[in-house]
Amino acid sequence: GGKVAVNISAGKNIIGAFHQPALVVADIDFLGTLPDNELRNGLAEALKHAFIGENALFELFEKGDFDSIRKAESLMEIVYRSALFKSSVVERDEREGGLRAILNFGHTVGHAVESLLEYRGISHGQAVALGMAAELEISVRAGLLDRAHARRCTELLERYGLRIRRAGLDVDGLMAHMKYDKKTSLGRARFALLSGPGKPVYDREVLDDVVRAVLADTIVTGG
């Protein structure tokens, strides 16, 4: 996608630029050598694409399971469809003036999780999975998405071994880190959400009280 950035203690990807690569290499044989947890990290982003509009991927994930998608032909399909979907969005909005913001689904909360944990003890993919779980529920409470479809999505996250709750998070800490999100405007986070199956919306403001309640009810757990 061309984004290059660094993380600082206040937040993720706060300092960055756009610089397109000369070449992108996707080696399916290499993917096959990865341990399960690293493969799941990549699947989190592929599942995001499935949720926000890559309908063939959604169908593939619903029909399969973690063992079945480890096969080379399935990995090829997932990588191909994910790359095609993302590039089609980036080509229309390289510098994120609008449409490209749909790719941030799961990342407003997900980046806050990573920042709160100081980028230790959690992978980006797992943080995004937690973010999607929370932002699916925000979509429901905002009246955009029916609960049945939100549940279909969270069930897929769990089926592929991605956690949707985590100990060690606290609502106040997450809210504080979201204030530094690059999508924040006038001190309030802006979200990419779902308005239906494969129908993302972006730049949505959500009341802090709603976000707090969702975090407490979804991804934050004691212990």
Locations of regions flagged by a protein language model:
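Short glycine- and Lys/Arg-enriched binding-loop motifs that mark or flank ligand-binding interfaces
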Residues: 1, 12, 23, 38, ...
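A glycine/threonine-rich phosphate-anchoring loop and its flanking beta-alpha core
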Residues: 1-66
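A generic hydrophobic-helix recognition signal that picks specific residues
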Residues: 13, 20, 99-100, 189
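Short, acidic Gly/Pro/Ser/Thr-rich loop/turn segments
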Residues: 31-33, 54, 110-111, 199-201
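Double-stranded RNA-binding/processing signature
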Residues: 32, 68, 98, 218-223
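C-terminal charged capping/lid subdomain of soluble metabolic enzymes
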Residues: 38, 44-46, 144-223
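Active-site segments that bind and position negatively charged phosphate/pyrophosphate groups
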Residues: 59-172
